[in-house]
Amino acid sequence: MTNMSRVERRKAQNLYEDQNAALADDYVDDGESLPTRQSVKNQREQKKKQGKTKTPLFTVLAVIFVFVPVIVLVTLFYLKSHPDNHDDYEDVFIDSSQSKYEVVPKSEDKNDTADTKETALQKESKKEPEDSKPKEQTAADKKQTAVAEKEDSPNKEEATAAAASSSQSTVQQQEQPAEPVQNVPNRVVKHTVQKKETLYRISMKYYKSRTGEEKIRAYNHLNGNDVYTGQVLDIPLMDE
């Protein structure tokens, strides 16, 4: 719809310009002639040409797409025609004894390389027996320690068993409670608990202190300090 409307407007504008050009040809204002129809058309065409902006991007892209394959082909052809010359390189050998890189020039004889290899092999052969000696010593030491451990294992087991038995006996002796030394009372008094009488009062009556509570409780096999009215208690007394 937008394209059709633009075309229609463009046609109406062209028609309007043509009409103005026709009127300009027929009328003369103040003795000066108006531009002709042909001149108006020429001006309009020039404006259209000037309105079209020339974008160089398309031309640049076209040139790039043309020249890139050409450059690639030229480089490939050059590389194929001029291969790398490997004769210019020199051989490099590594001496394991010094751990340094040595560059052997191409002009030297091959005998030097053979000599260096022989010296390296001799040094390695000397190092091998020296390295094997400590390994043999360590193996012999391990064997001796294993034999000694086997010989000592029965003695260790006997010692551990004796220590365990002694520790068990000591623990049992410690766990056994010491038998309390019971003092035999000189005489025992029968006491009948009266109303509102407590173990504390009975102790103060016979022993004049609270130490008698424990004695009365132990002698009568009481679990606590509670006594009831009418209960008969045995009061052990020690004559001083």
UniProtKB/Swiss-Prot annotation:
According to the UniProt entry, which residue ranges have a biased composition of type Basic and acidic residues?
103-159
Q: Which InterPro entries match?
A: LysM_dom, LysM_dom_sf
Cross-referenced SUPFAM superfamilies: LysM domain
Segments for region (Disordered): 26-52, 100-185
Molecular function terms in GO for this entry? lytic endotransglycosylase activity
Q: Name one GO cellular component term.
A: membrane
What protein am I looking at? Uncharacterized protein YpbE
Read off the lineage from the record: Bacteria, Bacillati, Bacillota, Bacilli, Bacillales
